[in-house]
């Protein structure tokens, strides 16, 4: 029989500190209103983990001492171990100003400087980000006062930059060494342990940056019972942080691979009313999105994923688009097979799928694979219904 001993310990620490100073004031009889904020934040995250296992014959007594449970006694092939330890931290300095004139001309601006330990080994740990926004409450203008059914109309626009440092690697610029391999040299042959990088390091690794802007409006109508909002947005993700799959047995790498663009329209409408002690609301929303990879590391480069290479990412196409054979229909008869381009992939019979000859060479070959689908939905929408009576409420959401 076998005796087994296992031990698992994990200790994770997360500490966040925020130090913020805010100044608020109004000038010129309340015509000018200002709020200014400045400060800095820190974030620290660490993890320490210890694994262990032991199987050994009943005749070999395991000392009742945790420090000796994993000493290499007995059959070494049955002993396992493992350990994980890492820490990461960020420091951010920030400032923000919010201003309005007479409550109808609106402005806000922010700036932050972020530093991340993830890029400290490449010298790119610091990056600046900012945002600007403005709005015009048109319904407060004198020339809009006579429109009785219009309660509020606001035009708004904004532009900003954000950063991303998140990867599933604690030290993305410093890969771990794995000793899962060995080499044999000499006569007599001697086995030497070998070490391999978990992934190729990148000395130029840096922050992923997102540039986003949007413009739109929102309005309340019919005594604030009807609310409508519409926005056009565009988001460009640059210096995309991603892992490059290994090719032909090579190990993967990590880098800033390129640029991705998302753009579209967001719309939402809500009708809300009160009848006595009963209230109800009906809402709907719709979002369109066009996703496109604008560039990768170099022209013609592609990222292939999936056990059958069915997911492709390359410039000019949606990210992770489905790659395969386009189906034209089903072979109806042997005569249909004989009259169609020859399928060199397999022997086909009536009832099998008929693939398109994309390259037009008269044969169905692997070169006929093309984009056959987009994993990113072009349109998403949802509905919600709500009813309330006194202190009771019921809501239904559908997407």
For the regions a protein language model found, what residue spans apply to each?
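Extracellular/periplasmic, surface-exposed regions of secreted and cell-surface proteins
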Residues: 1-315, 384, 390
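Active-site loop/lid in soluble adenylation, ligation, and acyl-transfer enzymes
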Residues: 20-22, 372, 378
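C-terminal beta-signal and adjacent terminal beta-strands/loops
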Residues: 148, 290-292, 320, 332, ...
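Solvent-exposed beta-strand/coil patches in large extracellular/periplasmic or lumenal scaffold regions
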Residues: 202, 354-357, 374
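Conserved C-terminal beta-signal and adjacent last beta-strands/turns
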Residues: 281, 374-399
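Glycine-centered loop/turn motifs
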Residues: 308-320, 343-356
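C-terminal segments of large proteins
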Residues: 325-326, 330-334
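Acidic carboxylate motifs that coordinate Ca2+ or other divalent cations, activating on Asp/Glu
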Residues: 361
């Amino acid at each position: 029989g076998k005796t087994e001993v296992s031990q698992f310990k994990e200790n994770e620490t997360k500490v966040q500190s925020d130090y913020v100073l805010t100044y608020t004031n109004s000038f010129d009889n309340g015509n000018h209103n200002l709020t200014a904020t400045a400060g800095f934040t820190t974030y620290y995250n660490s993890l320490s983990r210890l694994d262990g296992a032991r199987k050994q014959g009943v005749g070999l007594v395991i000392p009742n001492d945790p420090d000796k449970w994993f000493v290499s006694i007995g059959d070494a092939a049955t002993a396992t171990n493992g350990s994980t330890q890492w820490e990461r931290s960020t420091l951010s300095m920030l400032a923000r100003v919010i201003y309005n004139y007479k409550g109808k001309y609106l402005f806000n601006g922010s700036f932050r400087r972020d530093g991340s330990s993830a890029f400290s080994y490449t010298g790119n740990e610091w990056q600046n980000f900012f945002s600007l926004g403005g709005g015009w409450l048109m319904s407060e203008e004198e020339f809009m006062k006579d429109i009785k059914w219009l309660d509020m109309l606001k035009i708004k626009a904004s532009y900003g930059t954000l950063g991303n440092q998140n990867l599933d690697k604690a030290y993305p610029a410093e890969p771990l060494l794995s000793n899962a391999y060995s080499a044999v040299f000499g006569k007599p042959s001697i086995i030497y342990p070998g070490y391999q990088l978990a992934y190729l390091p990148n000395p130029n690794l840096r922050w992923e940056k997102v540039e986003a802007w949007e413009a739109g409006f929102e309005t309340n109508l019919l005594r604030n019972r009807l609310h409508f909002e519409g926005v056009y947005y565009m988001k460009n993700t640059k210096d995309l942080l991603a892992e490059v799959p290994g090719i032909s047995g090579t190990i993967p790498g990590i880098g800033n691979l390129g640029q991705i663009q998302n753009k579209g329209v967001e719309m939402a409408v809500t009708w809300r009313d009160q009848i006595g002690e009963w209230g109800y609301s009906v809402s709907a929303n719709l979002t369109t999105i066009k996703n496109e990879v604008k560039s990768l590391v170099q022209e013609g480069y592609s990222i292939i994923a999936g056990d059958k290479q069915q997911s492709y990412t390359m410039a000019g196409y949606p990210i992770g688009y489905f790659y395969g054979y386009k189906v034209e229909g089903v072979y109806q008869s042997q005569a249909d097979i004989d009259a169609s381009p020859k399928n060199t992939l397999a022997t086909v019979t009536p009832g099998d799928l008929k693939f398109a000859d994309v390259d037009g060479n008269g044969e169905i070959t692997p070169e006929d694979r093309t984009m056959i689908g987009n994993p990113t939905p072009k349109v998403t929408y949802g509905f919600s219904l709500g009813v309330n009576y006194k202190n009771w409420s019921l809501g239904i959401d559908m997407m």
